[in-house]
Amino acid sequence: MCLEAGRGLRGLIGCTQPRRIAAHAMADRVAEELGCELGTLVGYQVRFRDRSSPDGYIKFMTDGILLAETVSDRELAAYDTLIIDEAHERSLNIDFLIGYVRQLLARRPELRVIVTSATIDTEKFAAHFGNAPVIEVSGRGHPVEVIYQPLGESTGAERKDRDLYRGIADAVQKLNRVDARGDILVFLSGEREIHEARDYLARQKLRHTEVLPLYARLSHAEQRRVFHPGPERRIILSTNVAETSLTVPRIRFVIDSGLARISRFARPSRGTELLAYSQGRNADGQQ
């Protein structure tokens, strides 16, 4: 839409994503749709990797990359359009960017800013940007049935983890019995939980099933495996990287542990952050 509206000619169309894997995947997809090689007209930049071109039209990046650019380019003159995606995540970087670009618009009225999300309070965000217009884009809707499965009431972290892995295995086995179509996406809070759940499922000797991990620190080749379904049913154990921006093909069932590691201030006076283990947010669950 931005390209059709003539944006990207006087500067880049910059699109932020909350995670590196999402920035890379989005750049891959858009480059494929435009029929160009990644790194030419469409590129991306994440920490330690830059495949963007100043002569291109579209640049995907993490929100941290764009925030870092404000240090050397306070006017963000390289861009004529900025898209802040997944604004409902409300990370520190996203909050800073939303406040910064609002002030920047007063100095650069020709700059266009688009804030996107499936679950934000549109009225509040529109008011924040001076009663900006709200555009609703209808997506493909599918009926979703939510089933709650209580876990055991064990005490102690290790026993609670075992209850969780047993609950996942029970749910998978039940799904295998009632409906063998499609793959299963399982949301867990971190890498350790993913590897432990993978080991637990391996001991169950599930037939005709492939178990794949998905988290930000995986190599690009390992991450790409989830986008290429095979003949067997796949169980994809993922952190919240697959909640937004990424569309994993052939998913029919989702098992959500309801737990996540969320970045929080440990000592606000010193600016220290930690990844706190907590229940997931409502907006993330709705997404």
Identify the function of each model-found stretch:
Residues 1-287:
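P-loop NTPase motor module signature
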